[in-house]
């Protein structure tokens, strides 16, 4: 969520329930094969790798750089996002997975538990920077104390704001609000300009909403799930405050009416056109937006109602498939993707977020402070961990969709609405 969305994940998560049930049926548990090996071999071996379409460009950039500088060769296959989970499930059952598998970070707990990935604990322990790897991704890829994956790419949520509209509204474009209450006041002033709207969200996109609003709860010191990922904690005062503000902005017209039916495909379009003052979204959106006289983009952390900051850390993890017979060559590639050479000179150079906190203040980030904000948030944000995350939160027919729709657009008290739906969400999380 990403993984998407999270920003990029909405479409691919629609098939989550079926795919994860298939994984449960075809894998009995974590594999111990070659779990203690630490060797990395670059001897001309050809290894296979799978990734999803939203991550294709990112993954291909790394593959091309590795292939150009190593004897080993990586053959990358890209699958459509909406069929990727089922493809993995089928291949896992037939023991025909590729050597290297990239996967949405929200599915890492399931993949680790079901034996899709090889245990990488001993290999990761050889990395002198292992403690600097994106903590949310590492936690998601760890099962019963063993590490099954490492960060591949990061897409995290942050506040995007249009500096042009801030100036027109008499706001300081270099000092964005540091509280949710402040975001509301700023959005209200931008909206008062008349020809634009103050704020926007994807009201019919469950992934978009959790990606951009859960950090507000975290920033307030709240939680959305229990530590086991089997119960929801969305019936809190912090959550009621957050969704109460979202509902208020819609009711007052600060958020345009079109937000109610925005299901994700075009949810960043209005901002990119310079017609929205403030909109939390994913970091990867920055690369695709063209700035000009109507749009100059500022980036800030997502705040809580009274302060604090956080981010939903989505994206992908990378691991060695349990059925691979080329683990040493696969590890050579994976470990190289985490190296300073790859993280800075390949990824940061192309305006991507580094997965290592010790490289966050790299040369390229110093040239664009927005990248520096993203890099710092990568170490501060959270990734909710639950085996049943997809069917509960990203499936448009799941219980979270009903909950957030009622919270944003319903007539009942927001707090009461969240309490009413919290039990249904918990039932889904706790289900097999």
Please report, for each region that a protein language model flagged, where it lies by residue:
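Extracytoplasmic/periplasmic solute-binding protein
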Residues: 148-152, 157, 181-232, 276
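Extracytoplasmic/periplasmic substrate-binding proteins
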Residues: 52, 212, 243-326
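Hinge/lid segment of periplasmic solute-binding proteins
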Residues: 106-156, 209-212, 298-300, 364-368
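Glycine-centered hinge/linker elements that transmit conformational signals in sensory
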Residues: 186-189, 229-259
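A structural signal for short loop-to-beta-strand junctions that line the ligand-binding cleft
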Residues: 91, 98-99, 127-165, 308-309, ...
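Long, aromatic- and glycine/proline-rich binding clefts that accommodate carbohydrate-like moieties
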Residues: 297, 348-398, 406
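Conserved N-terminal structural module of periplasmic/extracytoplasmic solute-binding proteins
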Residues: 2-110, 125-129, 173, 304-306, ...
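Conserved C-terminal helix/tail region of periplasmic/extracytoplasmic solute-binding proteins
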Residues: 167-168, 173, 251, 380-432
